[in-house]
Amino acid sequence: MAERERALTPPYGGVFVPRARVMDPDDVRRATWRMAHEILERNHGTDGLVLIGLQTGGVPITGRLAEAIDSVSGVMVPTGTLDVAFYRDDIGLRPVLPEAATQIPVDLTAKTVVLIDDVLFTGRTVRAALNALSDFGRARAIQLAVMIDRGHRELPIRPDYVGKNLPTRREEMVDVGEEGVWIGTLEDK
């Protein structure tokens, strides 16, 4: 495999082959800080704020956003992780994956939840997350933050906070990692 190529887990399978880097690590850092400021401004601080990262891509972004919010506000907001595999509407069409840990440290009742993912594509993962969150209390508000919004929505879902809008073709893939954001294709193993 080339330096950036990596094997992908189901449902995609195959190998991600990068075509171009669209955000370097500094771009991702700046986007994270901007989103942190936007979250604080929109919510008038950190009171009642909870950050929930979607397994697996949203989890590292959640940690970085929490650190940025702490640096700006001096408050470390509660964070958690959410696995939506069994809430998806396409569960029968995809291979069943091992369940990733859902860890939500607080009752979400009357809280403002910022749901965080790496890439927003069709909106189906977010729809599943909204269903899953209801098991943890009735949030006052749920907001959505994504590092990349690539369009191609199949459901009426729109993010509140976006690191970068990145128009893509449907067959392209986007990979968000520590080295930045890459656009590429999926090839058989």
Predicted feature residues:
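PRPP-associated nucleotide enzymes
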Residues: M1-K189
